[in-house]
Amino acid sequence: QINNAWPSMIWHLYDFYLRPAGGYFGAKRSMEALHPLYGYDDHSIWLVSSHYEDAKGLKLTTKIYNLDMTEKFTQENSADAPADSTAKIFTLPDVAGLSPTYFLALKLQDSTGKVVGSNFYWLSTKQEVLDWAKTNWWMTPTATYADFTALSQLPKVKLNVSERTERKGEESITHVTIENPSKSLAFFVRLKVAKGAKGEEILPVIWEDNYISLLPGEKREVTATYRAAELGTAKPVVEATGWNVE
């Protein structure tokens, strides 16, 4: 992967080899048609709809976890999302006993229970403070930073990963099931499809989702789509790495 060129924002999305980066999936997540989000300024929880039709009977589940995955807060809210709307659902209360680094998980379900939107945040009890006195024409420096050093203390986890691949015309689609059987968070898990065991990564590739964080016991299914010709005679092999993945 090459260093970011200017403008840096574009190169946070994908690199010269069309390898999608974490920023790509963050942007993709934010453009969900129904999207729950957290307001950093006032700790509010919002629901955004980009649909042109009303969505009724939604359920939003909000949970806060300490670094050790102790659940510190949970709340369920029923909501309707009018077409092309933004609505504040509620404001998080002050939660006692939070670890310096903690996590916020948002899950939005439709009336059938299907997950239609989600979001996951790692947050700090120490707020970032901007140094407004040193603002210039292109930036404002940070005086003090949020504290995420505790992320380095996350226990190592071993994931269960399985895959199957199907051919559709000139494309191959690899279906990946990834599960976190541990009692710890699997943080920022990156999946890649390689040309055989320890082979080169297949690029370009379109992942349904990636750079995933899995709560204890959580299982996810995602797909990767790429040109079948990229495989040659090799068998596709999925590899999972991550912040604290063995």
Locate each region found by the language model.
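Carbohydrate-binding surfaces of carbohydrate-active enzymes
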Residues: 1-209, 215-224, 233-238
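Basic/polar N-terminal segments that are highly enriched at the extreme N-terminus
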Residues: 244-246
